Amino acid sequence: MSNLVKIGIRPTIDGRRLGVRESLEEQTMNMAKNLANFIAENVRHVSGDAVECVIADSTIGGVAEAAACADKFKRENVGLSITVTPCWCYGTETIDMDPHMPKAIWGFNGTERPGAVYLAAAMAGHSQVGLPAFSIYGEEVQDKDDTSIPSDVQEKILRFCRAGLTVATIRGKSYLSMGSVSMGIAGSIVDQPFFQHYLGMRNEYVDMTEIKRRLDREIFDKEEFELAMAWTKEHCHEGKDYNREPMSEARKQEDWQTVVKMTMIMRDLMEGNPKLAEMGFGEEALGHNAVVGGFQGQRHWTDHLPNGDFSEAILNSSFDWNGIREPFVIATENDSLNGVNMLFGKMLTGQAQVFCDVRTYWSADSVERVSGYRPESGFIHLVNSGSAALDGCGEAKLTSGESAIKPHWQMSAQDAEACLSATKWPPADVEYFRGGGFSSNFLTHGGMPFTMHRINIIKGIGPVLQIAEGHSITLPQEVHETLNERTNPTWPTTWFVPRLNDEGAFKDVYSVMANWGANHCVITYGHVGADLITLASMLRIPVAMHNVEESDVFRPHTWSAFGQDKEGQDYRACATFGPLYK
């Protein structure tokens, strides 16, 4: 990405001259510089690039300096701001008044000067003018010459930065619908007001005949196609053909060529390709400025042409024939809401995302009945034909040897090769996909932490978010095969157990499944529920269910004015302030 979003640091100060302000200048500006260094060392853009911080040219003692800072931030493409101070400052004269910029204030917990008093006064001002801000205040008192950033402050700063960068980076980008509504799936009825008002994004649309046109008229890079085909033949190994009448070799070779071309075409539709301009296709070379897209596929395409499973899976992975790269985000069946969750997960972590059907709840009794094996608890079968990134198999390893999905900038060629080797590509089940193609098939390693999440749109409320943190499990191979053969064995599988807390939707695994709001979900590697909650609060999307520890929930300070129950607070605050871009 060009012109990357920056993080603005606003050092505010007591404006009284002739001694007070002068005595605080160095400490206040050093606080800003230390914070900028900390962020630069610990936060990256989704592209893997380092984050740049922009500090105001001077400390901010009043409205004139606040305005000068705002002007600088506009010139520098600042997308979120953190105000820092060790002392009292003039509340509403010094706060960030940008209506769309996520904002936080870190008030130094020291006794010599009342940084906490300014923090409280500023939060009151933010609440009164209707611009929610995040309050950051360390639990332990620090000495005035202590330049360290306490661990609890660090955690909140990093969470705010990850979520705020997501908000600022997706603003102005596009969701690209390739096709329309798939099989009546609600998420593929693209809700333009949601994208516009909550995310600040626009919607772009192309009919699937545009992909067919580019196939027929060869509007793709032919040199890259030769490279891609050679790579695919070497690294993408065919799996078992479960069809009653196996596909012929000639048909399979034709399908391989088609799905590789489809992959290139979908990518070019999203982000453009200067090579197309060299070929005389200047309009096609521009793309649609899309950070997320969806492919309808079923059934108008897949009844006649090879399915999109290969294209979706490869694009969503962190590697292809061009090497390691940032994953794209493509939602199968054009489920735009699941696509948004995939985008959130990628933006927060830099990792490839796994799109899943929430397919089956298996109780311990049911597993024992059909396999003779009794697991420790019930679990959920997550499986989908299409856009599960190959990284989801867990073959990339941490230095400890544990299975993981890594940020793409940490992926190695060996990691990519391991994921490819663990994936088979069975010919598509023609009962589902009459036009042929191939589906990815892998099994996710057990013991991996995952966060399952999904946005749903509720009439009268708007978007709501669901979150379930948990982990993958490993079943004995024969048990896995017994259960997997009962559904479609050509698709990738993750056996998932959410973390329970004996309350509400998380009293047992069955209740998580029963309360899930749609047929699809995203699983993101790691326990990132707290980051998702912070992000949702910035966008004014309430959280319907989650199992994140209350101590990890970080929302704007003014949420505490909306009652005592945390989730009720969230709904009332989001309804009161409304979507970020209303």
From Swiss-Prot:
Q: Where mainly found?
A: cytoplasm
Q: Which GO terms describe its biological process?
A: D-arabinose catabolic process; L-fucose catabolic process
Top-level taxon of the source organism:
Bacteria
Q: Which UniProt keywords apply?
A: Carbohydrate metabolism, Cytoplasm, Fucose metabolism, Isomerase, Manganese, Metal-binding
Per the record, the pathway is: Carbohydrate degradation; L-fucose degradation; L-lactaldehyde and glycerone phosphate from L-fucose: step 1/3
Q: Known SUPFAM superfamilies for this protein?
A: FucI/AraA C-terminal domain-like (SSF50443), FucI/AraA N-terminal and middle domains (SSF53743)
Record-annotated active site: 333, 357
Q: Which Pfam family, an example, fits this chain?
A: Fucose_iso_N1
Cell location: Cytoplasm
> Does DNA repair appear among the keywords?
no
Q: Which reaction does it catalyse?
A: L-fucose = L-fuculose
Q: Which cofactor does it need?
A: Mn(2+)
Q: Where does Mn(2+) bind?
A: 333, 357, 520
Q: Does the keyword Protein biosynthesis apply?
A: no
Which EC class does it fall in? Answer: isomerase
Q: What is its EC number?
A: 5.3.1.25
Kindly list the GO molecular function terms attached to this UniProt entry. Answer: arabinose isomerase activity; L-fucose isomerase activity; manganese ion binding
GO CC annotation: what is one? cytoplasm
**Which InterPro entries does the entry mention?**
Fuc/Ara_isomerase_C, Fuc_iso_dom3_sf, Fuc_isomerase_C, Fucose_iso_dom1_sf, Fucose_iso_N1, Fucose_isomerase, Fucose_isomerase_dom2_sf, Fucose_isomerase_N/cen_sf
Q: What does this protein do?
A: Converts the aldose L-fucose into the corresponding ketose L-fuculose.
Q: Per the similarity annotation, which family is this?
A: Belongs to the L-fucose isomerase family.
Tell me the protein's name. Answer: L-fucose isomerase
Organism field: Vibrio vulnificus (strain YJ016)
Gene name in the database record: fucI
